[in-house]
């Protein structure tokens, strides 16, 4: 049989997750569809920019390795 501390820990985590889920859904209801569209556009632009910076970083590292090897 499970010990009481494991049962109470599970109940506490379940209650916390349920409460967080409830408040998250309440927050989602306050955002209008046009605001979600703006969030989506801005999010995709930020993600594209981060992808560009990551690619640039690894290209610079590759170029430095090639220069160090004399290629």
From Swiss-Prot:
Task: List residues in topological domain: Periplasmic.
Answer: 28-37
Q: How does it sit in the membrane?
A: Multi-pass membrane protein
**Keywords in UniProt for this one?**
Cytolysis, Host cell inner membrane, Host cell lysis by virus, Host cell membrane, Host membrane, Membrane, Transmembrane, Transmembrane helix, Viral release from host cell
Q: Which InterPro entries match?
A: Lysis_S
Example of a GO MF term: pore-forming activity
Q: Which residues cross the membrane?
A: 7-27, 38-58
Give the GO terms filed under biological process for this record: viral release from host cell by cytolysis
Q: Does the keyword Transmembrane apply?
A: yes
What is a single cellular component term in the Gene Ontology annotation? membrane
Does the UniProt entry include the keyword Transmembrane helix? yes
Tell where it localizes. Host cell inner membrane
Q: Which residues lie on this side of the membrane: Cytoplasmic?
A: 1-6, 59-71
Q: Present the record's domain note.
A: The N-terminal transmembrane domain seems to be externalized during the pinhole formation.
Q: What is this protein called?
A: Antiholin
Organism equals Enterobacteria phage P21 (Bacteriophage 21)
Highest lineage ranks of the organism? Viruses, Duplodnaviria, Heunggongvirae, Uroviricota, Caudoviricetes
- Gene assigned in the entry: S
